[in-house]
Protein backbone atom coordinates (compact mmCIF):
# COMPACT_ATOMS: atom_id res chain seq x y z
CA UNK A 1 0.00 0.00 0.00
CA UNK A 2 2.86 2.39 0.87
CA UNK A 3 4.56 1.53 -2.42
CA UNK A 4 1.34 2.27 -4.35
CA UNK A 5 0.97 5.60 -2.55
CA UNK A 6 4.57 6.52 -3.44
CA UNK A 7 3.98 5.60 -7.08
CA UNK A 8 0.77 7.65 -7.16
CA UNK A 9 2.56 10.60 -5.53
CA UNK A 10 5.41 10.37 -8.04
CA UNK A 11 2.97 10.32 -10.96
CA UNK A 12 1.08 13.30 -9.55
CA UNK A 13 4.31 15.23 -9.00
CA UNK A 14 5.47 14.40 -12.52
CA UNK A 15 2.13 15.54 -13.98
CA UNK A 16 2.21 18.82 -12.06
CA UNK A 17 5.80 19.44 -13.14
CA UNK A 18 4.93 18.67 -16.77
CA UNK A 19 1.99 21.10 -16.66
CA UNK A 20 4.15 23.86 -15.17
CA UNK A 21 6.82 23.34 -17.83
CA UNK A 22 4.21 23.31 -20.59
CA UNK A 23 2.73 26.56 -19.31
CA UNK A 24 6.16 28.18 -19.26
CA UNK A 25 7.00 26.92 -22.74
CA UNK A 26 3.73 28.16 -24.23
CA UNK A 27 4.62 31.87 -24.07
CA UNK A 28 5.74 32.94 -27.55
CA UNK A 29 9.24 34.40 -27.75
CA UNK A 30 9.71 38.09 -28.54
CA UNK A 31 9.95 38.90 -32.25
CA UNK A 32 13.47 38.72 -33.68
CA UNK A 33 13.44 41.99 -35.66
CA UNK A 34 12.08 44.78 -33.49
CA UNK A 35 13.30 47.51 -35.82
CA UNK A 36 10.83 46.75 -38.61
CA UNK A 37 7.11 46.80 -37.82
CA UNK A 38 6.30 44.71 -40.91
CA UNK A 39 8.70 41.94 -39.87
CA UNK A 40 7.41 42.14 -36.32
CA UNK A 41 3.76 41.64 -37.25
CA UNK A 42 4.59 38.93 -39.80
CA UNK A 43 6.43 36.96 -37.13
CA UNK A 44 3.91 37.69 -34.36
CA UNK A 45 0.51 38.44 -35.92
CA UNK A 46 -1.01 38.03 -32.45
CA UNK A 47 0.67 41.29 -31.41
CA UNK A 48 -0.85 43.14 -34.35
CA UNK A 49 -4.31 41.64 -33.76
CA UNK A 50 -4.20 42.60 -30.08
CA UNK A 51 -3.13 46.15 -30.87
CA UNK A 52 -5.73 46.56 -33.60
CA UNK A 53 -8.38 45.46 -31.10
CA UNK A 54 -7.06 47.99 -28.56
CA UNK A 55 -7.05 50.66 -31.28
CA UNK A 56 -10.72 49.91 -32.03
CA UNK A 57 -11.58 49.97 -28.33
CA UNK A 58 -9.50 52.97 -27.20
CA UNK A 59 -8.48 54.84 -30.40
CA UNK A 60 -4.77 54.53 -29.60
CA UNK A 61 -2.88 54.05 -32.88
CA UNK A 62 -1.05 50.75 -33.26
CA UNK A 63 2.25 52.55 -33.89
CA UNK A 64 1.99 54.41 -30.55
CA UNK A 65 1.26 51.17 -28.69
CA UNK A 66 4.12 49.39 -30.47
CA UNK A 67 6.65 52.11 -29.66
CA UNK A 68 5.67 52.17 -25.98
CA UNK A 69 5.67 48.38 -25.70
CA UNK A 70 9.05 48.17 -27.42
CA UNK A 71 10.47 50.52 -24.79
CA UNK A 72 8.78 48.82 -21.86
CA UNK A 73 9.43 45.14 -22.59
CA UNK A 74 10.83 44.58 -26.09
CA UNK A 75 7.66 42.50 -26.56
CA UNK A 76 8.75 39.98 -23.92
CA UNK A 77 5.70 38.54 -22.16
CA UNK A 78 7.67 37.81 -19.00
CA UNK A 79 9.75 41.01 -18.82
CA UNK A 80 10.57 42.13 -15.30
CA UNK A 81 12.72 44.89 -13.83
CA UNK A 82 16.20 43.93 -12.64
CA UNK A 83 16.93 42.94 -9.06
CA UNK A 84 18.20 45.40 -6.46
CA UNK A 85 21.32 44.35 -4.58
CA UNK A 86 22.59 45.35 -1.14
CA UNK A 87 26.35 45.73 -0.90
CA UNK A 88 26.44 44.81 -4.57
CA UNK A 89 25.84 41.10 -3.94
CA UNK A 90 22.78 40.41 -1.75
CA UNK A 91 19.56 40.29 -3.83
CA UNK A 92 16.88 42.52 -2.28
CA UNK A 93 13.98 41.88 -4.66
CA UNK A 94 13.05 43.55 -7.91
CA UNK A 95 13.13 47.31 -8.43
CA UNK A 96 9.35 47.38 -8.88
CA UNK A 97 6.32 45.12 -9.37
CA UNK A 98 6.26 45.78 -13.14
CA UNK A 99 5.57 42.67 -15.21
CA UNK A 100 4.87 41.58 -18.75
CA UNK A 101 4.46 43.27 -22.10
CA UNK A 102 3.18 46.56 -20.67
CA UNK A 103 5.32 46.58 -17.50
CA UNK A 104 2.22 47.57 -15.53
CA UNK A 105 2.68 47.87 -11.79
CA UNK A 106 0.54 45.78 -9.44
CA UNK A 107 -1.57 48.72 -8.22
CA UNK A 108 -2.16 50.20 -11.67
CA UNK A 109 -3.04 46.77 -13.07
CA UNK A 110 -5.55 46.24 -10.27
CA UNK A 111 -7.07 49.67 -11.02
CA UNK A 112 -7.38 48.73 -14.71
CA UNK A 113 -9.07 45.42 -13.89
CA UNK A 114 -11.58 47.15 -11.61
CA UNK A 115 -12.27 49.98 -14.06
CA UNK A 116 -12.77 47.73 -17.09
CA UNK A 117 -14.32 44.72 -15.36
CA UNK A 118 -11.60 42.58 -16.94
CA UNK A 119 -10.90 40.70 -13.69
CA UNK A 120 -9.08 37.80 -15.39
CA UNK A 121 -6.65 40.02 -17.28
CA UNK A 122 -3.01 38.91 -17.19
CA UNK A 123 -0.02 41.13 -17.81
CA UNK A 124 1.67 38.29 -19.71
CA UNK A 125 -1.19 38.11 -22.25
CA UNK A 126 -0.64 40.38 -25.25
CA UNK A 127 -4.37 41.10 -25.64
CA UNK A 128 -4.71 42.21 -22.04
CA UNK A 129 -1.46 44.19 -22.13
CA UNK A 130 -2.49 46.07 -25.29
CA UNK A 131 -5.93 46.75 -23.82
CA UNK A 132 -4.28 48.04 -20.64
CA UNK A 133 -2.08 50.41 -22.63
CA UNK A 134 -5.11 51.69 -24.52
CA UNK A 135 -7.01 52.24 -21.28
CA UNK A 136 -4.06 53.95 -19.60
CA UNK A 137 -3.33 56.22 -22.54
CA UNK A 138 -6.98 57.29 -22.52
CA UNK A 139 -6.54 58.17 -18.85
CA UNK A 140 -3.66 60.40 -19.96
CA UNK A 141 -5.96 62.19 -22.39
CA UNK A 142 -8.51 62.84 -19.63
CA UNK A 143 -6.11 63.62 -16.78
CA UNK A 144 -3.20 65.25 -18.59
CA UNK A 145 -4.52 66.38 -21.98
CA UNK A 146 -2.04 64.26 -23.96
CA UNK A 147 -3.19 63.41 -27.49
CA UNK A 148 -3.38 59.70 -28.32
CA UNK A 149 -1.08 60.28 -31.31
CA UNK A 150 1.61 62.00 -29.19
CA UNK A 151 3.84 59.00 -28.46
CA UNK A 152 6.51 61.06 -26.68
CA UNK A 153 4.22 62.64 -24.11
CA UNK A 154 2.06 59.53 -23.80
CA UNK A 155 5.23 57.67 -22.84
CA UNK A 156 6.20 60.32 -20.29
CA UNK A 157 2.73 60.12 -18.71
CA UNK A 158 2.89 56.31 -18.83
CA UNK A 159 6.27 56.25 -17.11
CA UNK A 160 5.70 58.99 -14.54
CA UNK A 161 1.98 58.49 -13.94
CA UNK A 162 -0.46 61.27 -14.73
CA UNK A 163 0.14 63.11 -11.45
CA UNK A 164 3.91 63.04 -12.02
CA UNK A 165 3.48 64.11 -15.64
CA UNK A 166 1.26 67.03 -14.60
CA UNK A 167 3.90 68.13 -12.07
CA UNK A 168 6.59 67.89 -14.78
CA UNK A 169 8.64 65.36 -12.79
CA UNK A 170 10.25 64.17 -16.03
CA UNK A 171 12.03 67.53 -16.44
CA UNK A 172 14.47 66.50 -13.69
CA UNK A 173 15.31 63.27 -15.57
CA UNK A 174 17.37 63.94 -18.70
CA UNK A 175 17.68 60.19 -19.33
CA UNK A 176 13.87 59.85 -19.42
CA UNK A 177 13.49 62.82 -21.78
CA UNK A 178 15.98 61.12 -24.12
CA UNK A 179 14.06 57.82 -23.95
CA UNK A 180 10.72 59.58 -24.54
CA UNK A 181 12.19 61.31 -27.60
CA UNK A 182 13.34 57.90 -28.87
CA UNK A 183 9.84 56.48 -28.28
CA UNK A 184 8.40 59.32 -30.37
CA UNK A 185 10.92 58.70 -33.15
CA UNK A 186 10.24 54.95 -33.07
CA UNK A 187 6.49 55.60 -33.29
CA UNK A 188 7.08 57.71 -36.42
CA UNK A 189 9.18 54.92 -37.98
CA UNK A 190 6.63 52.25 -37.08
CA UNK A 191 3.84 54.41 -38.54
CA UNK A 192 5.67 54.71 -41.87
CA UNK A 193 6.57 51.02 -41.92
CA UNK A 194 3.02 49.90 -41.12
CA UNK A 195 1.67 52.08 -43.94
CA UNK A 196 4.07 50.44 -46.41
CA UNK A 197 3.56 46.83 -45.32
CA UNK A 198 -0.25 47.05 -45.52
CA UNK A 199 -0.08 47.75 -49.26
Language model features: what each stretch is:
Residues 1-8:
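Short, Lys/Arg-enriched N-terminal segments with co-localized hydrophobic residues
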Residues 20-23:
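C-terminal motif of bacterial Sec signal peptides marking the signal peptidase cleavage site
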Residues 10-17:
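Sec-dependent signal peptide recognition
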Residues 17-18, 31:
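Residue-level signal for mature regions of secreted extracellular proteins and peptides
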Residues 27-199:
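Catalytic glycan-binding domains that act on GlcNAc-containing polysaccharides
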Amino acid sequence: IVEQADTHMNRTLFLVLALVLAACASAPPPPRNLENACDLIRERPDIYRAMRQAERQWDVPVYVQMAAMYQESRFDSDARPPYRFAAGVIPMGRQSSALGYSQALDGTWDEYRRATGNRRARRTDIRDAADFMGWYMNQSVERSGVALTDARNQYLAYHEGNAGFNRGSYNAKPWLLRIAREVGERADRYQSQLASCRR
